[in-house]
């Protein structure tokens, strides 16, 4: 049936901040849906709280609201915009939950808003564990025996009936949050208590265990005509019992028989029809010896559908959006081939592997075990002609400096350690399989211990055989076969005892070069018009390089802490800029979740690891005019110097555009940067460099404790710490010296209680455009990526702001920056200190762009390609009459055992933005978006160190005046009462009940303010902070943030929150000419 004429305006709900379990895949699907609806002439209103997304760009939708994703706020947007319909299945679990709540509240009915695509009833049947089970039984599809419970007593009863182990699955949660595998009665009670709390409807399903069965997923699509197609089938290398988002996944299925594959395909189609889902949907099965169980259905676009889209080239979100407004599969054109309809099932003639990227390098103390709830932050995808090739490419895409054969880290493992690692799934299991094979374990033994199919273990055995052959010397035949299997020249060089350059030159002299194949949805049966390629060492090459002026942009790889979706945002903007200038733009990247790897984002996409060899291979083929490294985060910046060297070595004319690699090195290399600042006469904190533990002690003593220590060249403050005394320094040196290979340790004076400042600017070598000056709410010493910050600054005097601008201009011009620069400063006792400069895109670029209405990344890309700021009329300075606040989302609730204290190591996974006409309301909105709802009534618990008591008394008085009640520990409550602030005393944890934990567990405490001191109180505080996370109570660990919270609560009690679209705010920006 043709598209509906009554649907003229549609509301799309985004998925909010990047968090574990819900990453960039929803920006990718949301952006695709926006384009798809607007192609059909439908007006799109978008609401999302995450500024770092492409979908919240003003030109992606007709109206963009960056507001908290809570039903009350979305209801106000509906009241204002009056959309005809709402699409729930694009914004992940957040979008589904909000749509369900709006329906329950009667808002949709009141304003006549129809749920388009998958209906609320279908969402409920798929998400409510009990309804889902009944629906499956009704159509005769086998499900594991299970019982849905809503209390711990019911869980005890269910356990008696089903036995242990049990899988606990909460209803309506994200990434398996709150669930797990219970092997004992105690574990069951603990997991059920968390799960019931996390579930929106206070329900969990206890399910008989199918741990060890093969996990298989089908991505299916259905339209209103009841036409169904399967887009892709995927097999998890890891068996059941691990969340599919935590598993290594391969498509097509490798180990099932043709009969089993067809049986599951029929079941998948049967299920999507029975549930009445319209659009894309993901169905998970457990399979063993020819029988199967249906595990769950996601009635929405998901992480797996992003993977399926990228693996096959079939644009699931685009088609889902068109189905939602009434089109059918045979009416929708396949945009990749331009000639086949969307009702043709895609076929693949290659192997695709996805590996998750975990944050354990940042959370050394967190539990690494993988279960049914997610811990990974992102993922990589690789394409090859064989399983081995795809696996090798995927491992190097992870950017963890380790490949299968890397032994350094694993030498100390004993055989018993290896057995334990095979038995317990962790992020290291793949490497444990390699180690076990190297140590002579049989394939059967490894398979029995790990429950992983022998097929996958044999593929790793093949890689080991190839390594052993190479150790016998390099011959043309061996080199050719090793390259076919996915080996890098650098790895081959290690095995044969040559340098990487020698292997590369020998390979090129033999004419062994990669060919590029196209991903075209149809195994080359039809011509594809969207060029999307992967490399392999095969005979025929499908790549036809053009003679146009063209640029290669390096992407940022998998989402991880410290390198998030912000860099993908910048990559996409760079493409737009180049296209506007008539330059062909190509991307190399390997993250299946992002907009940059969408089939129609760039002129050509290379789905490849971002390593020196893989990038050079593409450059050799395409002969670019230039390469851009500024937008791909540290991954790309780290390649700048080696890439320039290799281009010169091979005599290629391609240049690195923008700031020169030498200038990047000056900014990254501490000694060179210090010299530059001294020459410019710009103050910096006292600092020194140490190459040994003894030297470190001497330097720290000269500077005076506390000091900030870190290795040189890092991203996201990895292995950075504030050290208060010599014993702390000794411990750090033991831990950190491992981090820096030939790089020394940097030691800085730690500026206590300074105000931290962040500036994003674009320079063309003559003029400097300052996008914004951000004032941090947390004091210096907390990583800038973890700090809340505000535009414009709220407490800095005018003369300080003038100094900041002056320093930014002088540093940018001295470094001859062409493109973006981010500079971090600290203000203390009347002096502005420069902490660091990064001549690359920063994680605040999207936030600044949304706040002031200037697309900085796009402007920077044009400057790098030769435009000047004056030519673009951008020799200006923006001034805004409102306040924008950026707040971060921390992953602690998904990582049991990690402490929630912030420090110089970056911990956050994503960000949100609050925007209103004063700092209080903007901060209130930002906290609401970050799931830290500030209370307007109830109890506030305060426990602070002595030096904070004077400041906190004033904050506490403001809370009491706002009608909140205060409880505090001994010292703090005494001090508050002495200052005339009423406060009730509660016991410290180790003094028995009633203590603060009892209040938290009873749900009476609505806000916790706890600044830590000594190690004992850090531990005591750890218990308080940890239970705050577990019971979802907002907590604050700095005095500055407590002040901001007080102001926010006062303003929210007095004033109305403004609900306005981004373009309405941007119209109020004034530009001052310079």
Swiss-Prot record:
One of its GO terms (cellular component) is cytoplasm. One of its GO terms (molecular function) is carbamoyl-phosphate synthase (glutamine-hydrolyzing) activity. Residues 1-399 are annotated as: Carboxyphosphate synthetic domain. Mn(2+) 1 binds at residues 284, 296. Mg(2+) 3 binds at residues 824, 836. It comes from the Archaea. ATP 1 binds at residues 129, 169, 175-176, 208, 210, 215, 241-243, 284, 296. Pathway: Amino-acid biosynthesis; L-arginine biosynthesis; carbamoyl phosphate from bicarbonate: step 1/1; Pyrimidine metabolism; UMP biosynthesis via de novo pathway; (S)-dihydroorotate from bicarbonate: step 1/3. Mg(2+) 1 binds at residues 284, 296. Large subunit of the glutamine-dependent carbamoyl phosphate synthetase (CPSase). CPSase catalyzes the formation of carbamoyl phosphate from the ammonia moiety of glutamine, carbonate, and phosphate donated by ATP, constituting the first step of 2 biosynthetic pathways, one leading to arginine and/or urea and the other to pyrimidine nucleotides. Mn(2+) 2 binds at residues 296, 298. Belongs to the CarB family. Mn(2+) 3 binds at residues 824, 836. This is Carbamoyl phosphate synthase large chain. Residues 544-933 are annotated as: Carbamoyl phosphate synthetic domain. Residues 932-1074 form the MGS-like domain. Its cofactor is Mg(2+); Mn(2+). It catalyses: hydrogencarbonate + L-glutamine + 2 ATP + H2O = carbamoyl phosphate + L-glutamate + 2 ADP + phosphate + 2 H(+). Residues 400-543 are annotated as: Oligomerization domain. The keyword Metal-binding applies. Composed of two chains; the small (or glutamine) chain promotes the hydrolysis of glutamine to ammonia, which is used by the large (or ammonia) chain to synthesize carbamoyl phosphate. Tetramer of heterodimers (alpha,beta)4. Residues 133-325, 674-865 form the ATP-grasp domain.
